[in-house]
From Swiss-Prot:
Species the sequence originates in: Mycobacterium tuberculosis (strain ATCC 25618 / H37Rv)
PROSITE patterns in the cross-refs: CHAD, CYTH
Name listed for the protein in its UniProt record: Uncharacterized protein Rv2226
Pfam families cross-referenced by the UniProt entry: CHAD, CYTH
GO CC list: cytosol; plasma membrane
Domain of life: Bacteria
InterPro entries listed in its UniProt record: CHAD_dom (IPR007899), CHAD_dom_sf (IPR038186), CYTH-like_dom_sf (IPR033469), CYTH_domain (IPR023577)
CDD domains recorded: CYTH-like_Pase
Amino acid sequence: MPVEAPRPARHLEVERKFDVIESTVSPSFEGIAAVVRVEQSPTQQLDAVYFDTPSHDLARNQITLRRRTGGADAGWHLKLPAGPDKRTEMRAPLSASGDAVPAELLDVVLAIVRDQPVQPVARISTHRESQILYGAGGDALAEFCNDDVTAWSAGAFHAAGAADNGPAEQQWREWELELVTTDGTADTKLLDRLANRLLDAGAAPAGHGSKLARVLGATSPGELPNGPQPPADPVHRAVSEQVEQLLLWDRAVRADAYDAVHQMRVTTRKIRSLLTDSQESFGLKESAWVIDELRELADVLGVARDAEVLGDRYQRELDALAPELVRGRVRERLVDGARRRYQTGLRRSLIALRSQRYFRLLDALDALVSERAHATSGEESAPVTIDAAYRRVRKAAKAAKTAGDQAGDHHRDEALHLIRKRAKRLRYTAAATGADNVSQEAKVIQTLLGDHQDSVVSREHLIQQAIAANTAGEDTFTYGLLYQQEADLAERCREQLEAALRKLDKAVRKARD
C-alpha cells in the first residue's frame, strides 16, 4: 500500500428505502409545493458484485463495497455511514483489474479489513425505473427509484463447491427516495414530505439498511447474525465504544480531515487510560503488550498533532498582533514550518496505520472487548472505582507543590504535566463509572494543564526558531513577544490550579457519599 494513496471522489448520499409488494402502485408527487415537474428517466439494468471479508466485517460496520456495471455511475462504490438517512459514497472508476479492489478505496477501510482477504460475498441485479423531481429553479430535488431486485449470495455465483450460508437466490421489490445534494446539505423536511407520499401509496420503511444487508440476513443497519453484544460492565462498555471511535477517526486520518490526528490520538489515550486503570478487570499485567502498543501509537500520532496545534496556535497569535509587531520571516518559520512538520508527521502516521503491527493491536483490542462481552457472571472481577485514580492525582499534586517550592521551572513543568495525565485517567474512569461531576472537574484540570503544557512546548519551539532566525540575521522581536504571551498564559494556568483541585476534591467526596 503506497504511503500516499489517491483520494477517491466523495458524495453525500441522503436516502430512505421502503419495502413494497409487487402490486403496489408507484406514488404521485402532485400537490407538493416544492416539486414543479417530474420526469421519467430511462430504465436501467444495474449489476453489482459486493465485496467483504469472510466474516463480513464491513457489513457489521454498516459499510458496503461494490463493483457495479450499468447506469450512469458505473464503477466501484464504497458507502460509509454518515448519520440518519445519510451515507458518504466514495467512488473509483472501473479498471482492467476486474475484481481487484482499488487501493484508494481499500485504504479507507483498512482498519476494518486489515490483512484479511476481501472477496465477493453477493451479486445483486437491479431493474430500475426512476423519476427525477425538479424544483421551481429547474434544479433536481430528488430521485425516486422503483427497483425489482434479484440477488445471489456468494455460493450461487462462485464455482461449484463454494460455501453458501444463505438462499441461492432472492427476489424482492423496493423503493428508494434520494435527495439530490450538491453542497453537502440535505432538506430533511422535503425528504419527510416525499416519504409520506410513499407511505400513503402502501410502502413500509425498509426492514434492512441496504440491499446487501437483506441478502446477508440483517434486519436493521449494522445488524448481522451472531454479532457481539455490548458489554454490561460500564468500563468495558466504555472501552468498546472507544474502540469503535478509534476506527472512525482512523478513516478521518486517512482522509486528512482537520483535527483527525488529534482526535485519534485522544481516543487512543482514552483506551489506554481505561485499560491501565482496569488491568485486573481485563486480565492484563502491568507490562501488558496492548498498553505499550497504545502508547507507541499515541507517540507516532503526536508528531502530526503537535505540529497541527502549534501551527494553528501561531496563526491565531500572529493574526491578533498589530502588523508592525510581526517582523521578519516569523510567519514562514512558525506557521509554514509547522504545516510542513504536520505533513511529515501525517506520512509517518499513515505508514503506522498500514502496518501489520497496527492490525495486531486492533485484533487485540477486538479480542479484549469480545472476551469481556461474553464473560460469565462468575468471571466478573471487582468493580472499577475512582478511588485509586484520585489518589494518584493527589499524590501528583503534592509532588508538584514540592517541585514548585524547591526546583526550577523544568521540574515544576514536568510535575504539572504528571497531574494532567493522572487527571485525564481519572476523568475517563469517572465517566465510565457514572461519576459525572468528578469527570467534569477532572476535565477542567486536564484542559487547564493541557494549555500549560502546550505553552511549555511552544516556548521551547520559539527559543529554537529565534536562535535560527538570529543566526540568519533576521529580526527576532516577534519571537520574544510571543514567548512572553505564552509565559503569561502558563502563569494564569498555574494560578487557577489550586481552586480546580479543591473543586475536584469536593466532587470526589460527594461521589463517595
